[in-house]
């Protein structure tokens, strides 16, 4: 049984990473040709700053979260309390990191050349806070993670095609990335809570 779950999860993770690579390649081609070299570089710079900051948002929870979820698999009240604690803590940390980045930019002049782009990118911290991978890993439901990821990335790619038309739209690229993930993750958590 364990071997079957391991193989299934392994292939689902491969599919998940394949989707990530495919969407990244398509988005890169579209964004680079639409935004130009300079704006595309700033988009990725802002994305890098926020993603590095988001490490603190998920710090430790991607390791101990699945283990603790697995321990409470058959105890729905304890599992729900644990999920609430993890999500609440991650959201509080996301707010803290957003405030720190805002203050560094607004008051101290860090990231000044792409401040607006960075502000719009802060939503990625909150989408990271709601990322349900720890839940799927703890319940051996990696296929769900692949499905959620595919939906979020597909919606992001569609929004890029629809709304990113000129170099000045660079400000909104990371916002679209964050908002699609955030909405998909909120809907996913609603479904999870209804099923639990």
PLM ranges: what are they?
Residues 119-122, 146-163, 167-195:
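Hydrophobic alpha-helical transmembrane segments
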Residues 24, 28-32, 55, 101-105, ...:
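Structural signal for membrane-spanning alpha-helices in multi-pass inner-membrane proteins
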Residues 3, 115, 125-148:
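Membrane-interface junctions at transmembrane-helix termini in multi-pass inner-membrane proteins
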Residues 57-74:
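Helix-loop junctions and terminal segments of transmembrane helices
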Residues 17, 21, 48-51, 94, ...:
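Residue-level recognition of pore/gate-forming positions within transmembrane alpha-helices
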Residues 18, 22-25, 57, 63, ...:
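Alpha-helical transmembrane segments of multi-pass membrane transport and lipid-handling proteins
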Residues 35-46, 72-84, 95-126, 166-173:
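Membrane-interface helix-capping segments at transmembrane helix termini in multi-pass transporters
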